[in-house]
Amino acid sequence: SCRTAPLGAPGSKLIPYKSPDKAQSNDIAGTGFGLLPFLAAGITHKPAAKKSSVDYSKTVMGGINYLIRKQGKDGNYGGGLYAHPLVTIAMCEAYGMTSDPLIKVSAQKAIDYLIYAQHDGGGWRYSPKQAGDTSVTGWCVMALKSGQMAGLKVPAERYKLVEKYLDSVHDAKSGGYGYTDPGNSPVMTAVGMLCRQYMGVNPRNPGLLKGVDILKKVHPGVNPAGYNMYQIYYATQVMHHMGGEAWDFWNLGPESNGQRKNGVRDILISKQVNANKGKFMVAGSWEPGTAGHAESGGRLMATSLSMLTMEVYYRHLPLYRREMGGAKN
């Protein structure tokens, strides 16, 4: 199980927070990143049946209403094809949990826009119909999967196209994935592997097992340079679905003298900011760092991904139900 106590703290700081970071402003993406941790914790725009000390339903409602207002007639929320799938995931999650008909209309239009924007080669990039890159494609695949799980219409052939794209960036020798060409970038490998898992690839698939070895080498408890929240977010989902020793290694840390330590969950908890910095309300957040998209995404993205990563423990059921020899954590 995961220690979840810290998850309550960031939410209360997420909305009123004023950032001292120099991150580029993208209100669409920011709203998506702000909503997702609430939704992943089961908090929607509907008031909770049991009154808690703080009711975040109005905060979630405000974010959803903002996104619906921003959505174009073509279904695009704006902010580019990084922001659109991110927001689509949030809207699909909100609809899936509430069956709100207004959200259904918006979410289906958003899915339809993604289908329109997909390149013939199977991927997505910054503009509609542009030849894909693995990073944007990963968000789009998660959006389609969220829509499918919420009961929205997602044509099955779109996944076949995604497989075509993944094949084009997969390095069979290493088991890794590249950004636009075959490679073994750890972060792109995590994205590619998660997409494959969503496509139903067998957990014993040699390519997946090779990919696990790539991810183990960038475990932040083994390699401090591996502390990249974008990478950790995807890799945690991958390892969670793999289960067994792969998950134990990732979650609890490498084994030494019969014990595991420096697992991802403990590293994330230790890095949560405990106090404000002057006038800036940063308590409960995570520092953006410098790896990957951290500087452009800023503190909000780092905090959102950190929370979503820890919510994997109780939000996602492992895709692979078979026993693979690991501890039950």
Regions found by a protein language model. Give the residues of each.
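Preference for long, amphipathic alpha-helical scaffolds in soluble/luminal domains
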Residues: 1-329
